[in-house]
Regions:
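Feature captures hydrophobic
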Residues: 1-103
Length: 103
C-alpha cells in the first residue's frame, strides 16, 4: 500500500475521535515500510498531517494493519505494546492518552 492511501485511510478513521478533554499532545506514527504521519491535539482540536513531527511527545511504530485495528477498537494499544506489535518511544504517560482518544 502506498503512503498516501495508508495515510488517508488512517486519517479517515482517526478524524472523528473526540479530543475535547485530551491535554495537548503530539503523537508520531511510523508505519513500517510505508511512512510517517503525526496527530496533534491542541486546545481540544485534532490535526493530522502526513509529516514527521520532530518535537513529538511520543512515537509509535507498527505495521499498517496493527494501526488500523487499534484505531477501530479491534486491538488494545497497551496489549499491543506488551506483545511487541506496537513499539513506543518517548513519554509513556502521554502514550497512554492514545487509548483515551480511541474510546
Amino acid at each position: 500500500m502506498e503512503f498516501k492511501d495508508c495515510f488517508n485511510e488512517l486519517k479517515k478513521d482517526f478524524v472523528n475521535k473526540d479530543v475535547s478533554n485530551v491535554p495537548n499532545v503530539v503523537f508520531e506514527f511510523n508505519v513500517k515500510d510505508v511512512g510517517v504521519f503525526y496527530a496533534k491535539v491542541q486546545d481540544g482540536k485534532l490535526d493530522i498531517q502526513p509529516y514527521n513531527y520532530y518535537d513529538n511527545d511520543v512515537s509509535f511504530t507498527a505495521k499498517f494493519e496493527i494501526y488500523k485495528k487499534i484505531i477501530n477498537g479491534e486491538l488494545d494499544p497497551i496489549k499491543s505494546f506488551f506483545t511487541g506489535r506496537l513499539k513506543v518511544s518517548g513519554d509513556l504517560g502521554k502514550a497512554a492518552l492514545l487509548q483515551s482518544i480511541l474510546k
